[in-house]
């Protein structure tokens, strides 16, 4: 609700947005002031609690699954037409909402592949860090990916492209 309301108030025109995004922003426009203020109080309380935890445990990363479910197969028209599955979207945000709501930096890494549909679907871990501590998160993510893609673990899909390597000119 908070993000939708903030997005709506910062958007001068809805032209250029998809129909689904326009609907979400319209929902944000209908948020009662009372609910918005209660959400801000909740955010402040959560941020104070997290700040206390980091004061007690400097450098702590909060690690959770990225989502409570593995990725799902891409359907025939999904890439062309998109997908609108609100239940799955909400379910996949089970663990990421705290970082989103409190503005904490977070990074997700792949840690495995499970059977799903015609192939394999990714599963991941997410780490959330203290505000301003992005370097530690990036190091955790780099080490985690090196481990995940290490010898005998996960294999990259045939269509995988190393975009960072391409950008650096390493590929």
Indicate where each model-derived feature is located.
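Small-aliphatic-rich amphipathic alpha-helix that forms the alpha element of a beta-alpha
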Residues: 85-110
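Short, gly/Ser/Thr-rich active-site loops of penicillin-recognizing serine hydrolases
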Residues: 137-171
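Flexible loop/turn segments at secondary-structure boundaries
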Residues: 70-73, 115-117, 134-135
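Conserved C-terminal structural/oligomerization subdomain of aldehyde/semialdehyde dehydrogenase
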Residues: 76, 87, 122-129, 133
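Short helix-loop capping/hinge segments that flank enzyme active sites or metal/cofactor-binding pockets
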Residues: 1-51, 60, 65, 108-124
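Short, glycine/charged-enriched secondary-structure capping and boundary segments
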Residues: 76-79, 105, 114
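Short amphipathic alpha-helical coupling segments at ligand-binding clamshell hinges
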Residues: 39-42, 91, 136-143
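Short, surface-exposed loop/helix-turn segments at secondary-structure junctions
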Residues: 38, 57, 71-93
